[in-house]
Amino acid sequence: MNSLFASTARGLEELLKTELENLGAVECQVVQGGVHFKGDTRLVYQSLMWSRLASRIMLPLGECKVYSDLDLYLGVQAINWTEMFNPGATFAVHFSGLNDTIRNSQYGAMKVKDAIVDAFTRKNLPRPNVDRDAPDIRVNVWLHKETASIALDLSGDGLHLRGYRDRAGIAPIKETLAAAIVMRSGWQPGTPLLDPMCGSGTLLIEAAMLATDRAPGLHRGRWGFSGWAQHDEAIWQEVKAEAQTRARKGLAEYSSHFYGSDSDARVIQRARTNARLAGIAELITFEVKDVAQLTNPLLKGPYGTVLSNPPYGERLDSEPALIALHSLLGRIMKNQFGGWNLSLFSASPDLLSCLQLRADKQYKAKNGPLDCVQKNYHVAESTPDSKPAMVAEDYANRLRKNLKKFEKWARQEGIECYRLYDADLPEYNVAVDRYSDWVVVQEYAPPKTIDAHKARQRLFDIIAATISVLGIAPNKLVLKTRERQKGKNQYQKLGEKGEFLEVTEYNAHLWVNLTDYLDTGLFLDHRIARRMLGQMSKGKDFLNLFSYTGSATVHAGLGGARSTTTVDMSRTYLEWAERNLRLNGLTGRAHRLIQADCLAWLREANEQFDLIFIDPPTFSNSKRMEDAFDVQRDHLALMKDLKRLLRAGGTIMFSNNKRGFRMDLDGLAKLGLKAQEITQKTLSQDFARNRQIHNCWLITAA
């Protein structure tokens, strides 16, 4: 009897143990990452040929303590290598693990290689050659703390390399994991199986091989036992012949069918090639089809299983499309696949909850470094009186109501950008802004007292409901997470896409960027203030301080301002402002753009203006500003400097976003100024629910 070890992916050990026992293995013992077992020579070959779950089958040769590199060398040399393979065979060493002595795996592999070579040369035998790429013998050494475990890898290449798949493409799952997913899916061979996001077809091919009794090792060309001195070619040929006979019989007798689809024509072509190489192409129908076009191929036929490994995303901007995808799949399953089973393998359990289905079973597994879950569902058959499940129903109803109200109003006003929803319902704490045919959903960061998983799930529900109610394509929704406005949050860079969208606001054309920054380049709550500036600016010299992207300057210029001066510390935003001006035909010397610390520029400027707009940050301590700025503390000093630049009869429009801001009216009076609050006049319908989003004042000479 041989003592053997089969390695596998984490989470699949018990499944592998059952498989090995069914093959005839005895004394199976599960450990993390694999199964120890015993079997005769025939079982060695059968486990290699038939195991769908093992990553490698290894023959342990011994262990040694490693307190020095000499210990490793002597421990390896103590094994009788000349009984393991002939000197004419090539070999390679795979070394993993480190300790205080062996701190580099390459060094460890070199010491093992030296010990093996010396074992031959000391017996006056020819020196065996090393072949790292295609060796006849693979030696595996695993160092854990002070113990090195040495084994012969009888697999050669990993057993997931079945021989049917083109390795050039990126594979989301290995064949061994795919086989485990099939086994855990609840699918019964002989019933239909469908994968609507099949990629290169691995799940379907593994299922078809399982169903037709086709050994996973049947198409492999190389094995790790070819140079093994104890290899029994006669027994191997018997095992191989039996596998070929069973495969022919299984294919001839199998009557059910497999269905795969994917939106990418290139991967479908690869899937067809893989199925042909696996010998089961006649059983699988592959189609180029998006999930949105998914239909039940057997409406009147037997119930089957939908099995898939859907995409998931780690980037925030990919989530809306994935949420929409999972929500759509859930709806299609309920509408067209009543009575079927569904099994999905995913690295994002939160996305699976978008299906709006209750899982009957779930399994955990590792896909490389990723923690994954597989959930199995039974889709109930629909009845005539069954109603479709609503996602975030309260939120969806409010959004639908707001849409009906604001869409008509915005059209009449001549604006394309407006707020549709602003945390109207406390449990759905987001803002939803429309920019032409795009939508930006901003999630206000939830309090730490809110369970993070629940908050994330609610956000997913919001996105699914938003896409459904507004009828937009998922790629037209942009998701952002932010805290309530603080300091210079609007200057935070998020991306580098550089994609700008042209929008209209009354008679102005403006560029917005929905993806690269926390804000979009257009503060929607200041829309009426900008229109007022346009109406007040005819024939006047206009100054815009803390100008951001210059949208207020555009309105002033279109309103007939004699000149405009736009000042901001950011070169990025000044260039943006210049693009906005150019888009509206406002070019030339009459329209100046100045990059400067606004407060320092204000103290030094000696020009005169008829109309000044200033919208400073609530607080700023930018390294490029000379002093920290607090709008509540410093607004009077600001007005003192502004008064010096204000021409007789001129007006300052002063706005800020500080909640609870108090204007120092007495201090203004001492400066010879007076203030009129116009906040309510500057709040349009879409911001009427949030009366503290900004405050706005007109300041003139007393």
Curated annotation (Swiss-Prot):
PROSITE patterns: THUMP (PS51165), UPF0020 (PS01261). Residues 43-154 form the THUMP domain. Its EC number is 2.1.1.173, 2.1.1.264. Pfam families: Methyltrans_SAM (PF10672), RlmL_1st (PF22020), THUMP (PF02926), UPF0020 (PF01170). It is found in: Cytoplasm. SMART domains: THUMP. Gene3D superfamilies: 3.30.2130.30, RNA methyltransferase domain (HRMD) like (3.30.750.80), Vaccinia Virus protein VP39 (3.40.50.150). The keyword Phosphoprotein does not apply. It is an enzyme of class 2 (transferase). It catalyses: guanosine(2445) in 23S rRNA + S-adenosyl-L-methionine = N(2)-methylguanosine(2445) in 23S rRNA + S-adenosyl-L-homocysteine + H(+); guanosine(2069) in 23S rRNA + S-adenosyl-L-methionine = N(2)-methylguanosine(2069) in 23S rRNA + S-adenosyl-L-homocysteine + H(+). GO terms for molecular function: 23S rRNA (guanine(2445)-N(2))-methyltransferase activity; RNA binding; rRNA (guanine-N7-)-methyltransferase activity. Its main location: cytoplasm. Belongs to the methyltransferase superfamily. RlmKL family. HAMAP family: 23SrRNA_methyltr_KL. Specifically methylates the guanine in position 2445 (m2G2445) and the guanine in position 2069 (m7G2069) of 23S rRNA. PANTHER family: RIBOSOMAL RNA LARGE SUBUNIT METHYLTRANSFERASE K/L, RIBOSOMAL RNA LARGE SUBUNIT METHYLTRANSFERASE K_L. This is Ribosomal RNA large subunit methyltransferase K/L. It comes from Shigella boydii serotype 18 (strain CDC 3083-94 / BS512).
